């Protein structure tokens, strides 16, 4: 998928870039049976208070139901019917039509095409788009949509252009290197999909103007030093100030390098090397 640029007919178009969408199937609306309504909460919790700042507005979306598991379709071949855009994630999605007639969406791997036949299960061939237990995937292969708990469905490596690499297999665990640089152990019966995720140019897209952020449901981010003392620890003062202290969050938590991870987490024993800072 290439990057599309615009002639600067207006100042807002000068730095704006978008994806070309040439690789997507033409004229395909999302399958109605695999979509549902999505109500935006505008960052509010159940009591109506803001729990996540800078959310609100944006274009309406239908949520596409994605199959992150693929366990109940072991050894049933599926044909790729279309590759579609999904407004709810950075990756594209692929519509699979199984031999038994059922249709499902999955995250679209890189280099798959309409008409390809995919499969899942321990005996599936080593091929891009096929889902297998980690113990059945050769060392050195790239994978995505990795399970952390057997049967829960893929939780790791699900965004555009993402991939992880199988480094080793020993006993009940497989060593996997994630794109963040973290190296961790994952139970060998957990399922992963072979290959990288497509739409790798997503990271190079420039929003270009404030209005597009609003289309995506993102509201402005106001600096703490521009607020009043009642709103932020950096607020107040006569004229422009530096904030007068080390950077903190609105609730006084030190930021910019302060470690917030719990010192004793159950998952520490599975992490061989922490992610790159």
From Swiss-Prot:
- Asked if the Swiss-Prot or TrEMBL record annotates the protein with the keyword RNA-binding, the reply is yes
**According to the UniProt entry, which residue ranges have a biased composition of type Basic residues?**
258-277
Q: Which UniProt keywords apply?
A: Ribonucleoprotein, Ribosomal protein, RNA-binding, rRNA-binding
One Pfam family linked to the record: Ribosomal_L2_C
Query: Region Disordered: which residues?
Result: 32-58, 225-277
What Gene Ontology molecular-function terms does this entry list?
A: rRNA binding; structural constituent of ribosome; transferase activity
Q: Which GO terms describe its biological process?
A: cytoplasmic translation
Domain of life from the UniProt record:
Bacteria
**A cellular-component GO term for this protein:** large ribosomal subunit
Q: Which family does it belong to?
A: Belongs to the universal ribosomal protein uL2 family.
Annotated function: One of the primary rRNA binding proteins. Required for association of the 30S and 50S subunits to form the 70S ribosome, for tRNA binding and peptide bond formation. It has been suggested to have peptidyltransferase activity; this is somewhat controversial. Makes several contacts with the 16S rRNA in the 70S ribosome.
The record's section on HAMAP family has: Ribosomal_uL2_B
Name the PANTHER family for this protein.
Answer: LARGE RIBOSOMAL SUBUNIT PROTEIN UL2M, RIBOSOMAL PROTEIN L2
Q: Which NCBIfam families match?
A: rplB_bact
Q: How does it assemble?
A: Part of the 50S ribosomal subunit. Forms a bridge to the 30S subunit in the 70S ribosome.
**What is this protein called in UniProt?**
Large ribosomal subunit protein uL2
Q: Please name the source species.
A: Borreliella afzelii (strain PKo)
